Amino acid sequence: MLTVPGLCWLCRMPLALGHWGICSVCSRATRTDKTLCPQCGLPATHSHLPCGRCLQKPPPWQRLVTVADYAPPLSPLIHQLKFSRRSEIASALSRLLLLEVLHARRTTGLQLPDRIISVPLWQRRHWRRGFNQSDLLCQPLSRWLHCQWDSEAVTRTRATATQHFLSARLRKRNLKNAFRLELPVQGRHMVIVDDVVTTGSTVAEIAQLLLRNGAATVQVWCLCRTL
């Protein structure tokens, strides 16, 4: 994608503030118009009550905030960020997530965290890519929201197979005991930040780790939730 500084990544119109990356019109257009469960983030009847799935088998987190489904126009930007090394996209995407978080806080009283957590990459994958996209989303969020963030708060204990090609059952098995907590979280309100949540296996494994170590609450914030 050819880009010009000061123009919106999506519509190519001039930006009021060049560092925003995505204009206000496109920012509003990217938000899903579907009613989503506030806990699992999947389509539901009500946006303020847990869905039937969560009532029967709740995920190991209390709240999920997402901007949109994993579909255009956001999916191509996320793909470029991760696989074309366009790390400059991250700040614009992080701002979209911030706007969604602030909207949830205004409308539902969403609790802001004490600390946000990146989803870690295995060392070799991090080296090959040159960055962790979750870190690039967390860094501006922590600054804007005045909360703590440490890229090494959770680390990977081993390499795992690429999740994209695995079933939900194999994803869960693939990630079993794949993470280690490096910082105390007792009594803290935590948020896990990721770019895309599909089955939720990765964030579920990290959420369980945080809760086992005494975290008061765990939320998941992501750019896209596969709906």
From Swiss-Prot:
Record-given protein name: DNA utilization protein YhgH
Gene3D superfamilies: 3.40.50.2020
Biological role: Could be involved in gluconate metabolism.
InterPro entries, alphabetized: ComF/GntX_DNA_util-trans, Competence_ComF, PRibTrfase_dom, PRTase-like
Bilayer-crossing regions: none
Record family assignment: Belongs to the ComF/GntX family.
Pfam families registered for this protein in UniProt: Pribosyltran
